[in-house]
């Protein structure tokens, strides 16, 4: 009897899950855009059934007041300050060999690489707030003008997660959907990220891969 009840509940749950997916704009758009030769539909179905999916209404509010719209005088105060300079000097002293190794391989000025790492995440101190999935999911549903862009990025993100065996809800990033210490959007991560330490995985929070990816982006 218990088994029968459980079976009925399971069938009902799967039925409603299917209906909710068919009505989900994000699911529909991602299904259209994702490379199904790389990512099977069954994987997409599984991801969109995750109970951790949610929309964050704070995200449209953040877009309405972006840092990038500030004047240079305001913007400068966020980045050129004593604490960030100290963090940069400390990071350089601890990672000097790696920085020059990356610089030599890609023929990119080491201090440009360092500066970008400082601007994008303050050397790994400021890089997250929302899961990448939920950020892009929210943009699709709550920001119609960004839906096309966000669905392309969500498709790119799921391609990365599938290839590298990463839980899509495990990575946090900015309100815009950029992630990792280099703050790449998913399509750029797929295009420019490198496995600099040759461990078989492109890791957005490991400095060898991060610095290598930043340099590769600049080449």
Please tell me what each predicted stretch does.
Residues 183:
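Functionally critical loop-and-helix segments that line ligand-binding/catalytic clefts
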Residues 1-4, 12-147, 151, 159-172, ...:
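Cell-wall glycan-active module
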């Amino acid at each position: 009897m218990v088994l029968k009840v459980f079976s009925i509940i399971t069938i009902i749950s799967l039925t409603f899950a299917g209906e909710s997916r068919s009505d989900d704009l994000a699911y529909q758009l991602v299904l259209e855009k994702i490379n199904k030769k790389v990512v099977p539909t069954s994987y997409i179905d599984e991801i969109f059934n995750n109970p951790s999916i949610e929309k964050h209404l704070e995200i449209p509010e953040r877009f309405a007041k972006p840092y990038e719209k500030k004047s240079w005088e305001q913007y400068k105060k966020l980045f050129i300050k004593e604490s960030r300079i100290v963090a940069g000097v400390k990071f350089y002293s601890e990672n000097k060999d790696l920085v020059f190794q990356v610089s030599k391989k890609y023929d990119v000025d080491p201090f440009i690489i360092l500066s970008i790492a400082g601007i994008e995440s303050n050397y790994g101190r400021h890089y997250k707030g929302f899961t990448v999935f939920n950020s892009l999911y929210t943009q699709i549903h709550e920001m119609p003008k960004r839906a096309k862009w966000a669905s392309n990025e969500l498709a790119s993100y799921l391609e990365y997660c599938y290839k590298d065996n990463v839980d899509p809800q495990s990575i946090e990033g900015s309100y815009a959907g950029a992630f990792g210490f280099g703050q790449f959007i998913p399509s750029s991560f797929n295009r420019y990220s490198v496995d600099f330490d040759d461990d078989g995985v492109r890791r957005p929070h490991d400095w060898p891969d991060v610095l290598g990816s930043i340099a590769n982006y600049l080449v």
